[in-house]
């Protein structure tokens, strides 16, 4: 899986939080799921990381640090990352959306805030037609959920599409 940055995770004392991480690779999708149930204030470093990724990865349609401060007050944060490896069978957005639907949050309707970061390379920018695929994913969230999204570029992606989805609630 392509990583846009290297991050050193903080040492968190056992019993302070519950984290489930898994890595799954298919022939077209590279998927990294990370579900964090926040139980203590020791999780600040991980929230800092999410905010850094969201704000520094969204240069075209930016997400602002001050707009993401609510994450420090949330009790549950679920972070999922998807990177397409499009081939002739599927378009890159179709392949990511299919995997997002397979691995979507357990109860999408319960989340109050949703952040979506979309990245492509400058040579293979996001097309307006590709954004239509995200509508199916977004429709499953509560109508009351606040949804924010950012768009950026990453030179390492070439023809791939990267999406990071962060869902949270109190």
Language-model features: locations:
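Tubulin/FtsZ superfamily GTPase core signature
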Residues: 1-170
């Amino acid at each position: 899986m392509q990583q846009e940055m290297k991050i050193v995770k903080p040492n968190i004392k056992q019993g302070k939080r519950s984290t489930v991480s898994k890595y799954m690779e298919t022939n077209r999708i590279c998927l990294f799921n990370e579900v964090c149930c926040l139980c203590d204030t020791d999780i600040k470093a991980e929230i800092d990381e999410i905010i850094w990724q969201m704000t520094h990865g969204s240069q075209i349609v930016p997400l602002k640090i001050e707009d993401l401060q609510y994450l420090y007050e949330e009790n549950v944060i679920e972070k999922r990352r998807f990177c397409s490896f499009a081939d002739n069978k599927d378009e890159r957005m179709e392949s990511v959306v299919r995997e997002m639907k397979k691995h979507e949050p357990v109860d999408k309707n319960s989340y109050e805030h949703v952040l979506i970061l979309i990245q492509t390379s400058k040579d293979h920018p996001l097309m307006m037609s590709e954004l239509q695929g995200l509508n199916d994913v977004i429709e499953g969230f509560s109508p009351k959920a606040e949804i924010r999204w950012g768009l950026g570029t990453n030179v390492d992606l070439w023809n791939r599409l990267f999406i990071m989805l962060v869902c949270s609630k109190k």
